[in-house]
A protein has these predicted regions:
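Non-transmembrane, aqueous-exposed alpha-helical and coiled segments at domain scale
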Residues: 1-376
């Protein structure tokens, strides 16, 4: 069976923490089931944690290691546009190997990746970044500044520090071989991009699919059919968040108590997140900034507005919703700028339902109609 090259990029459509880790793992598993050789790619730095739940139900929050480590046949790759804190990467490898995952023989670290050194973290912690902008102060901005000044050290400059963690080389100089699938887990969210309109309350890079492709060293223009082989998953959530503190404007800011939800904490700093109302404008910007025609939307955490969907995996369960919950979810879906691009709704930390936007409307309408019949 002939299997074409695929390139999938998972991006955040708001301000981060939209469940990109789970969606990335979903895509990896789909490509593996189609017979691809899958490259699970992590880019950028350790200021963002990506959460996945493995088959044993264990929750992993990874800052450096690609989330595909839970799939033993996936090739793991940290791209050239990454900043690597060696201590973080080593601790993650030790933790997952203690749980039975073998990663060193299948982890490739690009020699051009930037070595994030302890002094980068110290520089940010001694600055006013956290107070002024809500920064996590993990050294990424300082490392990138050194890279721009050409004073940063690359992995290839300090190979002895990394050679026992993985293979220091590009796993695929010709990346678009038939049968290969690259799944890139982007970091942050579109609204945190350096040029997305929220400066200075932003991260130190842009956060679109094309930016993450550059960080990974790949390009969709090398694919045989860009509209068929390239897919950007824009992940959004009902109530977007921003990190704690003075981290910038958040439309319709509210509280976890008012929403009736348990307060969330940031993956890296463990501070309580700020939370807001769904804002169609930032999602619309994210869709078009990421290519529109190649975009598919994953609506995460649908169970927060329709609790009966918690753990659901079948589309039929949407039609079985109580009318009140179906109406709330339908109202949310209608706010999404291009709802027909929806291909998935998340129903929990490790569960989701695959469907199309049209199917979702039909299922929700069926649930609402059932309630109307009962009223009659």
């Amino acid at each position: 069976m002939h299997v074409d090259t695929r390139l999938d990029v998972v991006v955040g459509g708001q301000f981060g923490s939209e469940s990109k880790g789970r969606v990335t793992l979903d895509v990896i598993r789909k490509r593996l089931s189609q017979g691809h050789v899958v490259f699970s790619v992590r880019v950028a730095g350790p200021n963002a944690g990506h959460v996945v739940i493995d088959e044993a139900g264990h929750r992993w929050a990874m800052r450096q290691l690609p989330v595909g480590f839970v799939e033993p046949s996936a090739v793991l790759f940290i791209g050239p546009g990454s900043e690597i804190d060696r201590r973080v990467l080593a601790s993650e490898i030790e933790a997952v190997e203690a749980a039975g995952y073998e990663v060193r023989d299948r982890l490739y670290i690009h020699p051009e990746a930037t070595y994030l050194e302890p002094h980068h973290i110290v520089a940010e912690k001694h600055s006013d970044l956290t107070k002024r902008l809500g920064s996590t102060a993990k050294g990424i901005g300082a490392a990138r500044a050194d890279r721009i000044w050409r004073t940063a050290r690359r992995v290839s400059d300090v190979p002895a520090l990394f050679e026992n963690l993985g293979r220091i080389r590009n796993p695929a100089p010709v990346w678009n071989a038939p049968g290969w699938a690259w799944v890139i887990e982007g970091t942050q969210g579109y609204g945190l991009g350096l040029h997305a309109g929220h400066y200075p309350y932003c991260t130190s890079s842009n956060a679109r699919a094309i930016d993450f492709c550059a960080m990974a060293g790949v390009t969709p223009w090398d694919l045989p059919d860009i509209y068929d082989s390239f897919r950007v998953w824009v992940v959004v959530r009902p109530n977007p968040i921003r990190v704690a503190g003075n981290s910038g404007e958040l439309a319709g800011e509210t509280s976890w108590t008012d929403l009736g939800l348990e307060a969330e904490r940031t993956t890296v700093t463990q501070k309580i997140r700020r939370v807001g109302q769904f804002d169609p404008s930032i999602v619309n910007q994210a869709i078009y900034a990421n290519g529109h025609r190649v975009v598919r939307i994953a609506l995460a955490m649908a169970d927060q507005v329709a609790p009966a969907l918690a753990g659901a995996t079948e589309a039929s369960e949407v039609a079985d919703l109580e009318p009140e919950q179906a109406m709330v979810l339908r109202d949310l879906v209608e706010k999404i700028p291009v709802p027909y691009l929806i291909r998935q709704i998340g129903t929990g930390p490790s569960t989701h339902i695959d469907l199309t936007g049209d199917d979702l409307f039909d299922l929700l309408d069926a649930a609402v109609a059932t309630g109307a019949e009962v009223d009659l």
